[in-house]
C-alpha cells in the first residue's frame, strides 16, 4: 500500500481535479515493466538472431539499439536466463531500463560522436550509463565517479564485462568536483534521489515518504549540480537526471540554478517520464548548456598526486601487439590497456584513479601473462584455440577460472 503522504502530495501537485489520471498513475507506478536491453554497436544483428533463437521477442524502442524483451509462448525462463547468455557474459549487451537510457541518449543527441571529449559521470554505479557513454563517445575519455565505496565492485564488474578501456574510476564526494574548474566537455549527473520512480522493481522507496526527507535530498542535489556546473567548460553540456517524480528534486533544482546563475546557463530540454503515460519507470532529465564562466565561492584546493605508481609501459609482449588507439600503462605488476590515453594523461597528477582503463594481465619474471579478457585490446598471433562447451564454462573462464580443454 502506498504511503498516504506520497499520494496526497502527488494528487495536489500534479493531478488536481484529474482523478482519472491520478488513479491511472497509482495503478501503474508499482506494476512490473518489461525488461529492455542495449546492444553494443556492431553486434546488433548477431545478438538479435541468437536471442530470437532462444525464444526472446525483441521489440525496437525509440532509442537506437535498445529493445524491449518479451517471450514466446514456449519460452522456458529456467533454461534461458538473459543474464547467463553468451552475449551478456562477453558484454555484447547490457540489461538497462528504458527511461534510464534516455539521459545519455539526450547528452549525445542520439548519435555516436567522434570528437575527443573529457566526460564526467558524477554518480556512475552500477555502470549502465557509464558503459553507454563509452559507446556513444568512443574517441573520448570518461571519468566514472562513484562516491560510495560499497558500490564500486558492481561498477567495476560491469565496466570490465562491457569492455571500457576509455574509462577510469574515481571515488570522490560529488561536491569535490568543483575544485576541477571548467575541466570537462560533457557531464552526466544522475543524482542520488528519493527513487519514487523505481517502485516497479518492488522497492519500498516511498514507504516512509515525507516532504522533509525530500527537501534534504534536494539540498544535496543543489550542491551536486553546482559542483557539476563549476567543473563544466564554457560551451559544454550536461544532463541532470533522477528517478524521482516530485518537483523539488527535478523542476525545483532547475529553478534553483536558473536563479543562481541567470544567463550563464540555459536549460535547453527537460522531460518527466510518467509510468502511466510512457510505460517506463518514473524518471526526469534535463539538458543544460553553460554559456559563461562560473566562479565558485570556494577556492580550489591542490590535490595530492596519488598515481605515482601508474607509468607508461613499453616492453614487448612477444606474440602480442596493441590494437589501434590503445596505450599500455603499468601499476605495480599489473598491465593496463587505456584507450584515448592522451585525453586523460594531463590529469594523472590531478586526480586519484581507482581504476584506469582495463587490466589485461600482469608482468612477472620479464614475462607477460594475459588475463581472460586481454584479447579485446591485443592483436594476438600464433595462438591455440580452445572450444568452450557452454555458457557455464564461459562464465567460469571469464571469472579467471582454469579450464582443462582439448585444443582445436
Q: Which residues fall in each region the model found?
A:
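A short acidic, Gly/Pro-enriched loop at the edge of an enzyme's catalytic core
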Residues: 114-115, 176-190
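Helix-to-beta-strand junctions that scaffold the AdoMet/dcAdoMet cofactor pocket
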Residues: 232-234
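Mobile active-site "lid"/loop adjacent to the S-adenosyl-L-methionine
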Residues: 150, 186-227, 243-250
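Class I S-adenosyl-L-methionine
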Residues: 184, 237-240, 244-337, 342-343
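Conserved SAM-binding loop of SAM-dependent methyltransferases across substrates and taxa
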Residues: 126-138
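Polybasic, low-complexity RNA-engagement segments
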Residues: 1-54, 291-408
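Conserved class I S-adenosyl-L-methionine
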Residues: 114-123
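S-adenosyl-L-methionine
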Residues: 147-182
Amino acid at each position: 500500500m502506498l504511503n498516504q503522504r506520497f499520494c496526497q502530495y502527488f494528487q495536489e501537485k500534479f493531478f488536481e481535479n484529474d482523478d482519472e489520471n491520478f488513479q491511472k498513475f497509482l495503478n501503474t507506478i508499482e506494476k512490473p515493466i518489461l525488461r529492455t536491453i542495449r546492444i553494443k554497436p556492431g553486434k546488433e544483428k548477431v545478438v538479435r538472431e541468437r536471442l530470437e533463437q532462444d525464444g526472446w521477442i525483441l521489440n525496437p524502442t525509440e532509442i537506437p539499439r535498445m529493445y524491449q524483451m518479451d517471450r514466446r509462448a514456449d519460452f522456458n525462463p529456467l533454461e534461458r536466463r538473459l543474464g547467463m547468455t553468451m552475449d551478456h557474459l562477453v558484454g555484447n549487451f547490457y540489461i538497462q531500463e528504458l527511461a534510464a537510457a534516455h539521459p545519455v541518449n539526450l547528452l549525445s543527441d542520439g548519435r555516436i560522436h567522434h570528437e575527443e571529449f573529457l566526460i564526467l559521470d558524477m554518480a556512475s554505479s552500477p555502470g549502465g550509463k557509464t558503459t553507454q557513454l563509452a559507446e556513444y563517445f568512443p574517441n573520448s575519455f570518461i571519468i566514472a565517479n562513484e562516491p560510495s565505496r560499497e558500490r564500486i565492485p558492481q561498477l567495476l564488474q560491469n565496466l570490465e564485462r562491457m569492455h571500457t578501456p576509455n574509462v577510469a574510476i574515481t571515488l570522490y564526494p560529488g561536491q569535490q568536483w568543483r575544485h576541477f574548474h571548467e575541466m570537462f566537455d560533457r557531464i552526466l549527473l544522475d543524482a542520488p534521489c528519493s527513487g519514487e520512480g523505481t517502485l516497479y522493481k518492488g522497492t519500498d522507496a516511498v514507504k516512509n515518504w515525507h516532504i522533509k526527507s525530500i527537501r534534504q535530498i534536494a539540498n544535496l542535489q543543489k550542491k551536486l549540480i553546482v559542483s557539476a556546473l563549476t567543473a563544466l567548460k564554457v560551451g559544454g553540456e550536461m544532463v541532470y537526471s533522477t528517478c524521482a517524480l516530485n518537483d523539488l528534486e527535478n523542476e525545483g533544482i532547475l529553478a534553483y540554478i536558473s536563479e543562481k546563475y541567470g544567463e550563464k546557463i540555459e536549460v535547453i530540454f527537460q522531460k518527466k517520464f510518467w509510468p502511466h503515460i510512457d510505460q517506463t519507470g518514473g524518471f526526469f532529465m534535463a539538458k543544460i548548456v553553460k554559456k559563461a564562466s562560473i566562479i565558485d565561492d570556494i577556492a580550489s584546493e591542490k590535490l595530492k598526486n596519488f598515481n605515482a605508481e601508474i607509468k607508461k609501459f613499453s616492453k614487448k609482449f612477444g606474440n602480442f601487439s596493441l590494437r589501434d588507439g590503445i596505450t599500455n600503462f603499468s601499476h605495480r605488476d599489473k598491465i593496463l590497456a587505456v584507450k584515448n590515453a592522451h585525453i586523460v594523461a594531463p590529469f594523472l597528477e590531478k586526480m586519484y584513479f581507482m581504476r584506469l582503463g582495463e587490466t589485461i594481465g600482469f608482468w612477472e619474471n620479464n614475462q607477460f601473462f594475459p588475463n581472460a579478457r586481454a584479447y579485446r585490446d591485443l592483436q594476438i598471433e600464433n595462438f591455440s584455440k580452445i572450444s568452450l562447451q557452454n555458457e557455464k564454462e564461459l562464465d567460469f573462464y571469464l571469472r579467471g577460472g582454469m579450464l582443462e580443454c582439448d585444443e582445436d
